[in-house]
Amino acid sequence: MQQPQNITTSSISNNNNNNTSLTLQQQQEQLQQLQIKRKRNLMKQLQHVSH
């Protein structure tokens, strides 16, 4: 009973590692996009306030 459990956990951990390594770049890209959106929103707010 213990052997299949070990196999499944190891496979799951491997999948998690693959997912994280794959999504690291995507997360960075999403962060950059979010920062750009925030900057644009800030600029819009500043323009509205100045006017």
Curated annotation (Swiss-Prot):
It comes from the Eukaryota. Residues 13-47 form a coiled coil. The keyword Coiled coil applies. Keywords: Coiled coil. Residues 1-28 are annotated as: Disordered. This is Putative uncharacterized protein DDB_G0277499.
